[in-house]
Every structure is written in C-alpha cells, then in structure tokens.
Amino acid sequence: MEIYGIGTDIIEISRIEKAINQTSLFKRKVYTEKEIEHIEKKKHPYASYAGRFAAKEAVSKAFGTGVYGFSLSDIEILNDEMGKPYVTLYNTIKEKAKGLTIQISISHSREYAKY
C-alpha cells in the first residue's frame, strides 16, 4: 500500500472544552451532527471532542494543505460497532481523497488527545 501522507496532531482537552463552552458555533463549525450525537452519549465528551479535533487536524495535515480549502466538518470521525474510529470525507476534500484509504487511531490521556 502506497502512503500518500502522514499527519499527526495533539491537543489539550481543556482547550476544546473552553472553545465549546465559549460559543455554540464552535461545535457546528468543527463537528457533524452525527459526531455530536455520538459524542454527547459519552461519559467524558470533552476528551472525545478533543480526540476527533486532533484526528481532523491530522487528516488535513496528511493531505499537505492543513485546513485550507475546506471545513473541519468536512472530515467526519465516527466509530464502527467494535469501537474502531473511521473517517468519512465530504465536499472538496472527498474529491481530493478519491481512491485513497485513510487509517486513524485516537489516544487520550487526562489532559491530551492525540491522533
């Protein structure tokens, strides 16, 4: 399998918690409705929001563009029935990724979420 690009990101969970609590716009700009619905059922939702934020940033870095030309909500991170995270892309980034497979892993500690 050919590797197109590798992206990584780490973020403090408290930064995402602060952003979410400051304005309701943050969630709508960054996360899809499916992600929000899934995360809000979690025991520790801020860790999940942060993990998905880091994963979205990492996916954008793997394409070599960062978030230029699309929205973070165009990258959706959900979990399959076994809990494994997977990526669904929308709009312009979906076209850019045509034919590619994206592998992700998300880790959390008390303070950080990492992709």
Model-based region annotation:
Residues M1-Y115:
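Core catalytic alpha/beta fold that binds nucleotide/phospho-ligands
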